[in-house]
Design a protein with these regions (language model features):
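Extracytoplasmic cell-surface/polysaccharide-interacting catalytic and binding patches
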Residues: 4-216, 221-353
Length: 353
């Protein structure tokens, strides 16, 4: 009786072992993954281990997200959606994208990845990540540098961003430039508005622009490097009152324009130890025409969507010395509101305006 019972148990164990073997042989690790066809399944099983497959299933990663990258050396399944989003935002070699994300993912957030790669090239981002400490070690990359009400303060940087619709300022009075200069540019909307402003400013003295002469408009990162270093050479620790670090200048956005002023204006600004600024010597140098131009811009620039970017009396907010001939395009409605409220950009909440 005991022998029969033991024989029966042995048979059951053998049957269990055989069944378990055949179940393992027929087990499909991708049984809970409904997205792949036979060809994709074969590749997935070739490159992924069980832990990867579990991640694939729980995160519901689609074949179109993973298949372009799965065979690339260094592929990390946890970065799959980063790779896919990067490729959609800015096409490049998939191996390059995998290496880029693996190396710099910690410097970005997934929620802003698409915006960043819409406005900055991979090479520019690498250069920023590797050299951002050169001027401002606290700099923070702006993810959407194309917003026309963007204020570059608090260590915000657009690094080497270049607007896509820069428009040459033609048929307007400009200062003489070096022969290699390609002229002055603004973004298309701002350029159109400036054209109208200059035409209407003729009423100041009968000349196109009312005697105003464009001296500066869109400025590239490389040009800003030279301008900032020149300001440091001339003003030392006070340089930030007159010029911004490369990447942190609003001229790089393509919405800011300046007209020629007396060469000695900055030198004549007196900065006290308490940070107060005195423009008495500057104003003494102003001609009657310049006084008329300043008055006209204060009274009329908003009608064309421009504001005096660094106005007198707003130094505490802007952290810049008064620059009466520097205009910033913010759109007609915003400019009108700022004019009526006597506000500078730092005092505005553009998101609700």
């Amino acid at each position: 009786m005991v022998w029969k019972r033991m024989s029966f148990i042995a048979v059951l164990l053998v049957l269990f072992a055989v069944c378990f073997y055949w179940m393992n042989q027929s087990y499909d690790p991708l049984a809970r993954y409904p997205y792949a066809d036979d060809a994709d399944r074969e590749i997935l099983l070739e490159y992924l281990d069980q832990e990867d497959i579990n991640y694939l299933i729980t995160q519901q990663i689609k074949p179109e997200e993973i298949m372009p990258f799965i065979a690339v050396e260094g592929f990390d399944i946890a970065n799959t959606r980063w790779y896919s989003t990067a490729l959609q935002a800015q096409e490049d070699d998939v191996a390059y994208i995998v290496n880029f994300i693996n190396e710099y993912r910690s410097r970005m957030t997934y929620s802003t990845l698409e915006d960043i790669l819409t406005h900055y090239s991979y090479s520019d981002l690498i250069r920023y990540f590797e050299t951002s400490d050169d001027y401002d070690e606290q700099s923070e990359l702006v993810t959407r540098p194309d917003e026309f009400t963007l204020v570059l303060n608090g260590h915000k940087t657009v690094f080497s961003y270049e607007p896509s619709d820069l428009t040459l300022l033609e048929h307007l009075p400009v200062v003489s430039t070096q022969s290699e200069s390609k002229g002055f540019y603004l973004r298309a909307e701002a350029a159109t508005a400036l054209q109208q402003l200059m035409e209407d400013a003729t009423e100041i003295n009968g000349e196109l622009g009312g005697g105003l002469t464009i001296e500066r408009a869109y400025t590239s990162f490389e040009s800003q490097v030279a301008l900032y270093e020149q300001a440091v050479s001339e003003h030392g620790e006070q340089a930030s009152w007159f010029e911004d670090m490369p990447g942190e200048s609003e001229y790089q956005l393509g919405y800011t324009v300046s007209f020629a002023l007396n060469d000695s204006w900055e030198e004549q600004v007196e900065i006290a130890e308490d940070g107060s600024l005195d423009y008495s010597a500057c104003e003494e140098k102003l001609s009657n025409l310049q006084r008329q131009q300043i008055s006209w811009l204060r009274e009329n620039a908003y009608r064309y969507g421009f504001v005096i970017r660094f106005e007198e009396g707003k130094e505490a907010q802007t952290q810049k010395a008064w620059q009466p001939f520097t205009l910033r395009y913010v759109g007609v409605e915003n400019a009108r509101t700022m004019h009526e409220q006597d506000s500078c950009m730092e005092e505005m909440n553009f998101a609700s305006s």
